[in-house]
């Protein structure tokens, strides 16, 4: 609705005696005959008001538009797109047409639609559908309803068989909350955003000018070739890509001791803040002083993650980093609570995993910083090379039997990892346990019952890109010994998936208390609180929604803006 769209027509399927009869009701097609909009919406409202079960595909979209028209959907709602993502989180597509073809052998014949689009001088069958007369679209819309119902008949027993109904119900229970969150939106300070943008543009111009005046180079901060010329002029060393081209990554610039790369990096950050956060997020996506961001609870063609954690779009507030001491307040400071309220940031304290870094550092006889890097890196499936990069340790290059060159950890990194694993063997034991379960069973289950599948395969010896499906892998690798791929990341999947379960359980319980979060980001829930008691209530729910042997703690901080939420009440 905030993008200027509208409902062109409604597809409805009525189920009697196990069979679905579908109808398409056009109300706002550009060409052809439409039905009276009020009559159609009254009819739809009558259906939605009843307690009979409803089946939809992408209910967030359908119910969102119905909500925009003032129509509330009562009774059980079952979403086939949600069900598909829970049954198989590794699919490439979750479109109704592709699921219908793959799982029940039902696909749509889109030739009529394509021919109609062509004959009317249009281009995109999906985007231009509303421009066509309803008779061309009706068959398409009616088949959607029938396929959706038949898919549900296939999926419902599978959810029970695989003990996933509880997970599915949790996701469905969150839909009304997510729609309410998006509908309310988040207040933004547009006047201050415009002023900050002007300041940053001046700051960027001055920074680029200072690079030229101090170092004699006009630098395009995003061009490796331009930066190379500036580095060569100052006799500064830099890395190269495997193909020999100059490389100036964020990590390289950040750790470089010279002032030139520091100014280049600062200019990049300022330019990104202007383009991504001000133009693309705060000013570019605001509607009547609010941003209506969209959360994706499960994997779909529009977003989402394989592990059940939320992703975000239109705009993606998860990009609003908290790490830059200068720029973070200029971005997060634009997000406001409701009038007379405080912004409440309730953050799980080391939700995944609990902070045990100093204990491990003492056990291994190493500093806390490398202990933390290794703890987090290894549990998330990071290899030795990436760990060396994270710790600033050197790596080596070796030539394999196939003649290819491979990067491996250097001696310092290998020695540190050997010390870590010899002194802290339980970490390797936990990694191996989850990896072996994934390898042997093909799946692991999170604390909330969510399944994480490992259905990609790779050769036991040598390296080749993994292939989805055992049969396809056997054909590709010509019956060489194969094994499941990516099982070294099983512990990461377990931790991330369980964290998603916990956050979603908390959100459902908070919603039952009549409290609506403004946003969910990583391990944090953000609220607009009238009183500290509401904050304490949400904190208690978050800490106790899932009982674990190790207590989960939540840090509650408050302020006048998102950036200012670092204080006690």
Residue ranges and their predicted role:
Residues 1-30, 74, 91-94, 101-104, ...:
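Conserved "right-hand" nucleotidyltransferase catalytic core of DNA-directed polymerases
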Residues 16-54:
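Nucleic-acid-processing active sites and adjacent nucleic-acid-binding tracks
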Residues 56, 77-78, 343-347:
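Short hydrophobic beta-strand that contains or immediately precedes a catalytic carboxylate
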Residues 60-71, 84-87, 228-235, 349-352, ...:
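Short active-site loop/helix that positions an aromatic residue
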Residues 72-89, 96-101, 353-357:
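Conserved beta-strand -> loop -> alpha-helix junction used to position metal-binding or nucleic-acid-contacting
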Residues 143-149, 488-508:
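Conserved pre-motif C helix in the palm subdomain of viral-like polymerases
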Residues 540-550:
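A common structural junction motif
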Residues 563-569:
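Short, low-order "capping/linker" segments at domain edges
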